[in-house]
């Protein structure tokens, strides 16, 4: 069964292999997998995106990302979805944005991946009335947080391309943070912990032009930077892979409930242990004392950063290969696409018969 799948990214973040966010990276992996399998992949993303299949770009918002900018971007996405559905026989629409309900098609087989904490979504958006609208979590830990009344199918766990990431290199004496730069990611705490541990820290990530994000960077991150604690800005895949393979550890000081932590999986694929607060799904990703350390505060984080080189890189790689299989994730999505496409075909045949 050859499929035509329309993947729709969050309107305010570019999608592609070099994307910063986990949702955008997962979408990019699915786009590539669809094309490699001989299906038609269509991607809607804002200007600056890239795709293996057909890309429909919507305008990028040039200024502060306020509510007016969000509404403009959502309207552009609505128009792009309508254009795609008019041009191609779409089997499944796959939405990835937290604001998916703002541009949700009124009919047709639709899959929604809930990449972010479930309590960040409007409660009524998690209770679809349509039988051809399926919502799912990206981890069992996230699924367990579903509010009463939420209608979700089983989770489809995130994964990473271990073969593409793993590039064994000598470890260097620095800790690494890879993250969006915003208050809930707690990057200032990683800076404090690295300073306590007397270990250099490298930060790669993007400050999106939301007012709260730029204020956080200015007030909490920038004052803590010096010649041993550096902010590199956004990183492409090649630079990210090099840093992940050579760091003594990845630090995840997230204050939000991580739904799966793609970057933790990437670090383990590179043989790099993870030091993290036990937020959300992180205890399901990091095995304390084996592939990293789960810590309770900045002091424990500093101790774990110092101890990280004692953990075996090959154990980290082996666990990533065993537990975070990209093939398994892609297969699960393909199964969901086919099931939804059959549902759409059956509905169409029923409507024709009537």
Which ranges hold each PLM region?
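Catalytic cores of nucleotide-sugar-dependent glycosyltransferases that transfer UDP/GDP/TDP-activated
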Residues: 1-354
